[in-house]
């Protein structure tokens, strides 16, 4: 085994006089040099605390503005405080966090992943479509987003984004995914608070969830069962919407749910 431990205070490749109080802390444990890591920070008080294990992990992190955070845990496999922990191989993460205002509400991305071949692309301050098309940022992006991932298993894919264009409005996404071969897309955007709690714990689900527009929408989704579920949920409009699903699919052909609320 080998260990790589380093800590950088201030922005990478920029002078301390221009940007201060950025911090990067990375612990790598493994037997291979195939880890790829690309980090860009621009602004004040951005923090990347990260730990790795095993081979072929690819992580790209871009943080702009101020008060962004990615995630960290000091104990393998514990998910301590649901902070960052990659303990597997062939994981791919692409994380962007963005704020273009003088004062940012803070974007957070906390994760604990234990397994192989996970692909997590999550954008805060941006909009991304289900086909991975990345749109331009809002002209007024004040941050205030939060997501916590806990992915155990292999070959999961997770794509999503959170953004708003007014200060004081926050989005949150708490996710637990323990099964394999799930295809998940989640997008929250627009003014007013949006919240989503997703728990899957089985395999081969196809999930698309969008919450948008200028109202406070919330969704709680719990899936499980012997067979997969195809879920499409859209909540929109200026009236607050709420949706909760607990699904235990026992149909050998799979289950399908499609819900649209608001106009």
What do these predicted ranges mean?
Residues 14-20:
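Sec/Tat signal peptide C-region and signal peptidase I cleavage site
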């Amino acid at each position: 085994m080998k260990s790589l431990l380093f800590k950088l205070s201030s922005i990478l490749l920029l002078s301390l006089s221009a940007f201060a109080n950025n911090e990067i802390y990375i612990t790598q444990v493994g037997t291979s040099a195939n880890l790829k890591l690309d980090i860009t920070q621009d602004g004040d008080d951005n923090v990347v605390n990260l730990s790795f294990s095993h081979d072929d992990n690819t992580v790209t992190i871009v943080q702009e503005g101020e008060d962004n955070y990615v995630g960290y845990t000091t104990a393998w496999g514990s998910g301590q405080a649901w902070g960052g922990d990659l303990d597997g191989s062939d994981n791919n993460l692409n994380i962007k966090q963005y704020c273009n205002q003088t004062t940012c509400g803070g974007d957070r991305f906390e994760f604990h992943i234990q397994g192989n071949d996970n692909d997590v692309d999550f954008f805060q301050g941006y909009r991304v479509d289900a086909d991975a098309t990345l749109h331009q940022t809002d002209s007024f992006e004040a941050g205030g987003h939060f997501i916590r991932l806990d992915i155990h298993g292999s070959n999961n894919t997770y794509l999503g984004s959170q953004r708003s264009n007014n200060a004081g409005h926050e989005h949150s996404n708490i996710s637990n995914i323990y099964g394999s071969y799930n295809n998940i897309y989640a997008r929250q955007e627009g003014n007013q608070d949006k919240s989503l709690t997703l728990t899957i714990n089985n395999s081969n689900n196809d999930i698309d969830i969008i919450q948008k527009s200028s109202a406070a929408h919330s969704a709680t989704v719990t899936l499980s069962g012997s067979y997969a579920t195809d879920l499409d949920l859209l909540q929109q409009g200026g009236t607050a919407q709420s949706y909760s699903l607990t699904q235990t699919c026992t149909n050998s052909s799979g289950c399908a749910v499609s819900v649209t609320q608001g106009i």
